[in-house]
Amino acid sequence: MKFTPEFASGLLIQRYKRFLTDITLEDGTEVTIHCPNTGSMRNCLFPGNKVWFSVSNNPKRKYSRTWEQAQTPDGDIIGINTGRANALAEEAINAGTIVELQGYESLRREVKYGSENSRIDILLTSDAQANCYVEVKSCTLLENGQGYFPDAVTTRGQKHLRELMEMVEQGHRAVLLFVVQHTGIHSVKAAEHIDPAYAKLLSEAHATGVEVLAYSADMSPIAASLVKSCPVKL
């Protein structure tokens, strides 16, 4: 996906109240921008380092700027906006980049499913294949050279795993897709040290037939796209 106009830049001061971030613009002005990431953002916050943001022309928005990307001290780029993960996944599926998800005739977003009343991120259907339920997760946590998910305890994520398992039991195909929005992550693993219940459930889901995939994003202030498969350590 191309960003038009391309993202503007500044320097990070602080993130607070989950949805707010203070930055310094290139001209030295300090402003508050919207943070579209509700997670802990563990190892994603580097005060003084470069950040990039988009600008909305919607006059009803209190904060016109949205934090999109951050640079680490090592020079890696992190995609802060978790909302872009689904769009990156959809674009990659349509382009045939995710080879494991090729061959479907229809793609729908946010379809209701499961006994716990969730909405699947992507539902792929085809007359010749079983329905494929794809749950998308953004992976941005890098610790000691290893990529992890989640970055905080996620009961919602646990619910999604249970419902993917339910789809497999019903004869459908179920896929957990990690969209890796950190250029320094080269493999993904369940963060047992952060959410042991999620790690245990992921292992159970995989054993029952839920497929676990990860694809890495190439990112810049101009564009972003999923470009290659990333190993998942189960």
Swiss-Prot record:
Pfam families attached to this UniProt entry: SfsA (PF03749), SfsA_N (PF17746)
Superkingdom of source: Bacteria
One Gene Ontology term of the molecular function aspect: DNA binding
CDD domains for this protein: SfsA-like_bacterial
PANTHER family per UniProt: SUGAR FERMENTATION STIMULATION PROTEIN A
Family per similarity comment: Belongs to the SfsA family.
Protein name per Swiss-Prot or TrEMBL: Sugar fermentation stimulation protein homolog
Gene from which the chain derives: sfsA
